[in-house]
UniProtKB/Swiss-Prot annotation:
It comes from Mycobacterium tuberculosis (strain ATCC 25618 / H37Rv). It holds the Pfam family Phosphoesterase. Keywords: Cell wall, Hydrolase, Secreted, Signal, Virulence. Belongs to the bacterial phospholipase C family. GO terms for cellular component: extracellular region. Predicted to be exported by the Tat system. The position of the signal peptide cleavage has not been experimentally proven. InterPro entries: Alkaline_phosphatase_core_sf (IPR017850), Phosphoesterase (IPR007312), TAT_signal (IPR006311). The keyword Secreted applies. It catalyses: a 1,2-diacyl-sn-glycero-3-phosphocholine + H2O = phosphocholine + a 1,2-diacyl-sn-glycerol + H(+); 1,2-dihexadecanoyl-sn-glycero-3-phosphocholine + H2O = 1,2-dihexadecanoyl-sn-glycerol + phosphocholine + H(+). This is Phospholipase C C. Involved in virulence. Induces cytotoxic effects on mouse macrophage cell lines, via direct or indirect enzymatic hydrolysis of cell membrane phospholipids. Hydrolyzes phosphatidylcholine. Does not have hemolytic activity. Optimum temperature is 37 degrees Celsius. Its EC number is 3.1.4.3.
Amino acid sequence: MVSQGAFAGMSRRAFLAKAAGAGAAAVLTDWAAPVIEKAYGAGPCSGHLTDIEHIVLCLQENRSFDHYFGTLSAVDGFDTPTPLFQQKGWNPETQALDPTGITLPYRINTTGGPNGVGECVNDPDHQWIAAHLSWNGGANDGWLPAQARTRSVANTPVVMGYYARPDIPIHYLLADTFTICDQYFSSLLGGTMPNRLYWISATVNPDGDQGGPQIVEPAIQPKLTFTWRIMPQNLSDAGISWKVYNSKLLGGLNDTSLSRNGYVGSFKQAADPRSDLARYGIAPAYPWDFIRDVINNTLPQVSWVVPLTVESEHPSFPVAVGAVTIVNLIRVLLRNPAVWEKTALIIAYDEHGGFFDHVTPLTAPEGTPGEWIPNSVDIDKVDGSGGIRGPIGLGFRVPCFVISPYSRGGLMVHDRFDHTSQLQLIGKRFGVPVPNLTPWRASVTGDMTSAFNFAAPPDPSPPNLDHPVRQLPKVAKCVPNVVLGFLNEGLPYRVPYPQTTPVQESGPARPIPSGIC
């Protein structure tokens, strides 16, 4: 594939003149005309990737794409014709497990009646075994049986629940204001920690020679355990500034499963308190250090942001609180227009959280190096493996927003991305290689440059985002489920019966951004 970047700064005439000088103009005109027209068709570009000086990354928690945006207009959602919306294993009429019973996706209504349960649903099983059983060898039809193994009968069908615009209005407003990606996948068929390891290092070390394979979420996060190279090290070596801003508000619980830190402290390389990994990957606090750096024009070129767990949207924590977190993050950037106008903020979700998604992820063929746990590793000694060697990924689809003056307008990108795509974007912008990225994964995921609309003038004006605090009163009803749901014993949300097939909102097609032009 010819990169459009090859034509940067060169007119059509200059391109063909250069080709003619090599005696190949006639051949190249026929061969390259479609490429040239695509590269120049929009006319002069209003922006370029180099105009983005700050890339800010934030991963929220445990929501699939269909679960949040199956009803959004013009995306690959509930209007897509597929039998996969009819999942077997639960009978809505009898409200019981039934191998032949069919459950359709159903709305979890948070806007009327006793909505506390809907706002804070029980936490589904989303670890390595359950995710692979849901995927079911690529059939993508094991969602309900996978939950029945570990969850109560009444809480099994919550994986088929979804939210609509009235339930998560801020999320839908973000999709209408910026760029949403409807083919963004988690990196691994499993839970939080391994996916976040992909977010900073593009691997979980399946070969097991540097502290892995780490394929499940441990109760206590490993300290100074792993030794493989991570993206922050490559950035430091290249002279690119970076920080990981972690919430410190849980104190002694920051290194337990109740926290979601950046995991830099899990690597032996961070043992020296004078090292870049310790100074920039462990010490910075969110939000205070982040706010200070934005205001003082000292925001690094690359930032990983890790809010407090209760703000992460992880079930059974309230989705409305997560909306507050996202809006507050955007508002921090808006406090300094000079920073905002040259920043790209990417907000995605680390994994599907057990919630259904109808798009079967692309996975690597068995035995693909770096994408399966090899036979040289004793699989029975790999915590949480259940004897399953792979595939590692891609995982299921998750929501992803690209928020920037260069991604305004309710845009939609259909290119395939995963968490390593965020690292690939950093690599593309700053010329830094992504460590551990397998050839297979590099060949099937993009670098996210196509999510930007560089052909249009940037729009740095403050977006019209209603602050979601008005959604918070209903959160008080969540208190019992916040505790019980995180322990997998939450009050169930009753599946409505009779069921109806969900539909997407009506509306025009969403424009596709230009990417690099």
